[in-house]
Every structure is written in C-alpha cells, then in structure tokens.
C-alpha cells in the first residue's frame, strides 16, 4: 500500500476545468472558515505557507527594527529557517523534549533576550496545553508568537468548547501544499488580529505577480504521478519495486519526488515566491473546506489508526529499539503520519521494505546542525536519526495496520534474539 495519500481527489481536479467559478464567494468562504477556526479577524491568502511567514517576518522587523532575534524549534523544516536567514534575522534554536517532541520550555526562556522579536510555535507533536504554556512565556516577555499550523489543520482540543490548532499564536500560518490534508497543489494563508499587518500585506501584495504557470504545471505532473502510483495493482507490481530500489541505492531523483524536503538547498528567495495564490489553488481549497463531512471522515479514519498504532505499540516500547512520543489528546495530536522512534532506522526501513511495507523514512531535520554551529540540540539530532512514520491515511485498513504491527513485533523479536 502506497504510504502517500493525496487528499485532493481527481473529481475536484477535473471540476476546475468545467465548473463556473465566482472567486469572490470562494475567497470569502475560505477566509470565513479560517477566521472562525483561528479566532482571528484578518485572513490573508498566500501562494505558499512560507510566503505568509516571509511577510510576517518582514513586517515585524519593520515594526521592531532593534529586535532581530527569532527562536525556532531545532527539529524543523529547513525551508522555514531559510526564510528567516535570508531576511537577516539572528536565529536561535531551542532543543526539544525527547519524550514529547515539543520545545524545551526551560531552555526557550534562557534563549530569550531583549532582542528577541519572535518565537515560532511549530505544531508537530504538541498538545493544546503545550501551546498555551509557550504563549504564556511569549506574552510575559512581550514577544510575537507565530503559530505554524501547516500539518495540524482541523486538529482540536475540546473541554467546554472546541479550540482548534492555529488559535493560539498572534499570527497563524497555514499550508495547502500537495501533501497536506487540504491539498491544493500550492497555497497558504495567514490569520491574525493585527490590523497593521493586514494593511502592510495589502500594500506589499500589489507588487506580487501571478503564480508562475510552469511551476504550477510541474506540480500538476507530480500530482498525476502520485495518483497513478496510488493505484494498488500498479504500486504493488511496479512502483513499490522502484521505491524499494531507490531506498537501497539512495537514488535521489526518485526519493525527491516522494520526499520534497530532500530538494532543499540554502539559497536566496526564488522568483516564484513573490506571487499570488493561483485561482486553481483557491478553487481546490474552497471545495475541500466546503466538504465538511469528508474532512470529518478523513479526520476520524486517521485518528482511528493513530489510536490503534499507539495501543498496540505501547507495550513494545519497553526496549532499546522502539520509543513512542507521548500522546495525551488524539484529537489535537491527530498526526498526518504516525511517528515512532527506532534504533537504526535504516535497518528498520529495509526490514519492512523486504516485507512489502513502505513507511515515511524522512520527516524533519535538526536545523541547528544545518544552520548553526552555536547550539547543540542533541534531542533534535536524535529525532532526525530515529524518527520514522507509519501510514494512517484513509486507504490504510486496520488489517493492513495489523500487518505492519506484526512485522514491527517480528523485527523487535529478531533484534533481541541477536
């Protein structure tokens, strides 16, 4: 079973070419939906998540020119760090807690100085309560909190009322890229209550060009390739063999298609960054946001598998081979892939590939190692070396999840017998 699931379905893709579209209605609906979830008044739509992030950083540097420091979780996506680097921010990295995957709150307070302008809250493994604790620190020191909600969209915590991820930060950023659970090829958004930022972006966006057609066309080709790869019979007899061989031979050309983060290189902003969101991405985002029943069903199917993996793996973690991230709330920590930490993930990956199982081998990186020689973030380094993810998308059945679990159990038994 192909581990990747593109949430944009082919029927929605085809509709773009045949349905009449009122973009005022489309944009209004997207903004209302994101505004309600994030509890923010202003919603701005961008060509990518990182572009929204870029303009927030430009705005906050202009607003506070004497404050030039930004704090990130060290375990992160390098493209986001590169945005701050290219804008000449002084970047500080905070290590993560090994048990939870969230930033070390004691360390983050030690990193804060009178020049700290921004803390980035990356929703990745955290609970809602974790986010509130970080918000309290940011508020105490009068620091802007940017909440990266790229991989947590629709996740929520419910006590008396629902609180969605994306509702904590002073600014919240969203991604509708091809691999996300709202998949629109490209696309992103910023939500905030800061009217001055709204005016700033409105003025800046006048200089943006239309989204580059060739860039969009390349993404459409990738979309088509991934859809073809997800056809079970083709995947089983053709594509799985190619993927397996690519892993064993470290074939970058193939691996970069299924792991976009491998394409990262440190560079200045490419021209396609400074573009508006395409009409195609707007339309796809609108259709998926409007289909609440499908989103809820996908959410629950993913949660079901996450709970199933956790309950079955929790008793297997009492060894040096496998560890689990602490999960307190399966609604808020409803991961797009189920993360586990394994000793020698190369060996683990090859063992599963030899049994017809594909897992997510690469997630994020220890960006402190990539961008700085100053901060040694050992837990982020361990996550980069140990973390893999099990598939949990709508087409993964409980029977197939059990097959994966059985092989993990066999791997641990074999490893302990050696």
Model-derived segments and spans:
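Conserved PLP cofactor-binding pocket of PLP-dependent enzymes
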Residues: 212-216, 312, 325-329, 345-387, ...
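Conserved PLP-binding active-site segment in aminotransferase class I/II-type PLP enzymes
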Residues: 1-66, 87, 139, 294, ...
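Conserved glycine-rich beta-strand-loop-beta hairpin in the small C-terminal domain of fold type I
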Residues: 3, 14-16, 255, 259-295, ...
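Conserved PLP-anchoring active-site segment centered on the Schiff-base-forming lysine
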Residues: 56-113, 352
């Amino acid at each position: 079973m192909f581990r990747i699931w593109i949430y944009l379905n082919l029927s929605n893709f085809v509709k773009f070419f045949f349905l009449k579209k009122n973009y005022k209605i489309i944009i209004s609906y997207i903004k209302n939906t994101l505004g309600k979830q994030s509890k923010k008044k202003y919603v701005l739509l961008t060509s990518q998540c990182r572009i929204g992030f870029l303009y927030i950083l430009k705005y906050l540097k202009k607003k506070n020119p004497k404050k030039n420091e930004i704090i990130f979780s060290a375990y992160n996506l390098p493209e986001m760090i590169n945005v701050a680097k290219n804008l000449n921010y002084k970047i500080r990295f905070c290590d993560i807690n090994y048990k939870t995957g969230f930033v070390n709150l004691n360390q983050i307070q030690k990193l804060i100085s009178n020049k700290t302008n921004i803390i980035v809250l990356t929703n990745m493994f955290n609970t809602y309560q974790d986010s509130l604790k970080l918000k309290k620190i940011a508020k105490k020191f009068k620091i802007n909190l940017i909440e990266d909600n790229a991989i947590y969209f629709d996740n929520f915590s419910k006590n008396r009322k629902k609180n969605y991820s994306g509702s904590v930060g002073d600014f919240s950023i969203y991604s509708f890229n091809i691999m996300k659970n709202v998949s629109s090829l490209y696309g992103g958004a910023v939500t905030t209550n800061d009217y001055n930022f709204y005016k700033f972006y409105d003025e800046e966006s006048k200089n943006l060009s239309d989204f580059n057609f060739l860039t969009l066309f390349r993404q459409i080709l990738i979309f088509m390739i991934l859809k073809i790869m997800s056809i079970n019979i083709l995947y089983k007899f053709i594509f799985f063999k190619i993927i397996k061989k690519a892993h064993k031979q470290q074939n970058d050309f193939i691996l970069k298609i299924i792991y976009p983060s491998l394409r990262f290189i440190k560079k200045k902003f490419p021209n396609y960054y400074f573009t508006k969101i395409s009409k195609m991405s707007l339309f796809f985002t609108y259709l998926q946001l409007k289909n609440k029943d499908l989103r809820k069903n996908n959410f629950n199917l993913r949660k079901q598998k996450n709970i199933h993996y956790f309950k079955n793996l929790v008793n297997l973690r009492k060894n040096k081979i496998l560890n689990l991230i602490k999960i307190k709330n399966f609604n808020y920590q409803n991961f797009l892939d189920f993360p586990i930490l394994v000793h020698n993930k190369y060996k683990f990956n090859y063992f599963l590939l030899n049994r017809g199982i594909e897992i997510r081998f690469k997630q994020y990186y220890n960006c402190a190692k990539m961008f700085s020689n100053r901060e040694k973030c050992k837990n982020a380094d361990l996550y980069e070396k140990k973390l893999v993810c099990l598939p949990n998308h709508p087409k993964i059945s409980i029977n197939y999840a059990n097959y994966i679990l059985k092989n993990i159990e066999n791997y641990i038994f074999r490893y302990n017998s050696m």
